[in-house]
């Protein structure tokens, strides 16, 4: 069922993004007087189609990995262009119209992101305060003088009020060499203490990096004691006699102070039996359990009892319509720049290409965010929409950015780029995009 849910959420997520993108092309083309012959979501065999009032065929196709808008064009051997309808063909349009039509797809993705973020910001944001809960021994954070209890209020001069805000600010520094400036102190005051943390090609080789943990910081989360919150039917823990509410004191003589201690202990011991000492309603009970082996990782089918988060550790931000709109535009701009910078760092070899993700990863994230709530899924949708818009603006033939380059050259030269050059460029671009997609899928499979 989980696989089916992931597939459905991937189809819904990609379907929304592709439809919005292609609708941008379609809407501007119709405003420019260009006849649209076909508006397709997906590729390959047509599953369902209908005729629009303007004569456009709308189609849903079998391979849901994209879409396209086919316009009347003299260069298309299948399209019958006469003197009567030549003005409705794409290639007969002035350069400004061509540029507007091509750029409308990515613009629609950015607009979708702004609208989604506007709704989320208007609804209000809630996040964990970026309080330092732990500093790893001998970590760069400890060596720099950071201590437990401080709150990160700025990263490189950018104000940060939540854990996610700190994470995003740190992610901007992936692959960099220099120093990260952290300002810590009281979030209610503008006065803070600054720490300079040296970095060299920071996390350049890391896959799915956790920037705070890389510095040796645990932010926002209160220490979680090893208390049983749930048990899986048929799991090793249930079979061993564990009960909800049991607090794990030790395992095989090793003290268990936090839930992470217990998880690491169990994961390292598949098919190995050991005794566990628990506190059950004030009495100590000894149980014997053997973790099941799941891909060489031990598991006992046990969930943690999460503590209540005190209100002092929660940051809430509400905005009015104008402020929410401004914040949505600014966040979209920041994420767009971050996307371009990350791609450029990848080209330079400053960050690992293992961070490229394909449709499998999108399906997994779409499913997990949907399970976390509608607002979380919408946040992912906005982020993915920005990524789609940015990628399509890359100056690669076949992508919208490549078409934009050709039309800019046409405007400068006063004539279109020779068709043979365009065809050869599109073939090279198609090969590059296909190779990139295969590499991303390879990364997805390697993570499974």
Where do the language-model regions lie?
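Aromatic-capped interface at the extracytoplasmic side
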Residues: 31-33, 116-134, 442-448
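Terminal peptide-recognition signature
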Residues: 21-24, 60, 105, 141, ...
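Alpha-helical transmembrane segments of multi-pass membrane proteins
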Residues: 14-18, 70, 109, 113, ...
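Functional transmembrane alpha-helices
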Residues: 85-96, 210-255, 260-390, 405-428, ...
């Amino acid at each position: 069922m989980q696989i089916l849910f992931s597939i459905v959420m991937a189809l819904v997520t990609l379907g929304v993004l592709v439809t919005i993108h292609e609708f941008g092309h379609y809407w501007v083309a119709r405003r420019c007087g260009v006849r649209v012959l076909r508006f397709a979501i997906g590729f390959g065999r047509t599953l369902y189609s209908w005729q629009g009032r303007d004569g456009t065929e709308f189609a849903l196709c079998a391979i849901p990995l994209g879409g396209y808008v086919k316009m009347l064009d003299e260069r298309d051997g299948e399209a019958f262009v006469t003197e009567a309808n030549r003005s409705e063909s794409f290639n007969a349009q002035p350069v400004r119209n061509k540029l507007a039509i091509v750029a409308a797809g990515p613009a629609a993705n950015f607009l979708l992101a702004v609208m989604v973020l506007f709704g989320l910001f208007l609804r209000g944001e809630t996040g964990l305060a970026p309080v330092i809960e732990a500093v790893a021994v001998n970590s760069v954070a400890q060596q720099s003088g950071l201590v437990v209890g401080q709150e990160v209020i700025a990263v490189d001069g950018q104000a940060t009020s939540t854990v996610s805000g700190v994470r995003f600010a740190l992610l901007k520094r992936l692959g960099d060499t220099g120093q990260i400036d952290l300002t810590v102190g009281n979030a209610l005051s503008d006065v803070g203490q600054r720490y300079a943390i040296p970095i060299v090609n920071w996390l350049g080789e890391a896959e799915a990096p956790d920037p705070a943990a890389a510095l040796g910081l645990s932010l926002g989360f209160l220490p979680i004691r090893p208390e049983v919150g749930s048990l899986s039917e048929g799991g090793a823990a249930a079979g061993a006699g564990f009960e909800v509410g049991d607090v794990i004191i030790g395992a095989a003589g090793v003290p268990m102070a936090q839930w992470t201690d217990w998880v690491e202990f169990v994961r390292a011991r598949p098919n190995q039996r050991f005794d566990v000492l628990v506190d059950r309603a004030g009495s100590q009970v000894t149980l014997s359990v053997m973790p099941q082996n799941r891909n060489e990782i031990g598991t006992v089918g046990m969930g943690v009892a999460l503590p209540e988060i005190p209100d002092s550790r929660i940051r809430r931000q509400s905005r009015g319509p104008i402020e929410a709109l401004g914040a949505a535009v600014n966040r979209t701009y920041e994420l767009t720049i971050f996307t371009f910078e990350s791609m450029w760092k990848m080209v330079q070899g400053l960050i690992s290409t293992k961070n490229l993700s394909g449709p499998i990863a999108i399906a997994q994230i779409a499913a997990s965010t949907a399970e976390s709530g509608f607002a979380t899924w919408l946040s992912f949708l906005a982020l993915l929409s920005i990524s789609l818009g940015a990628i399509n603006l890359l100056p690669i033939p076949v992508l919208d950015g490549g078409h934009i380059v050709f039309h800019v050259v046409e405007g400068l030269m006063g004539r279109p780029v020779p068709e043979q050059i365009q065809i050869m460029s599109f073939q090279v671009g198609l090969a590059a995009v296909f190779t990139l997609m295969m590499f991303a899928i390879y990364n997805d499979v390697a993570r499974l």
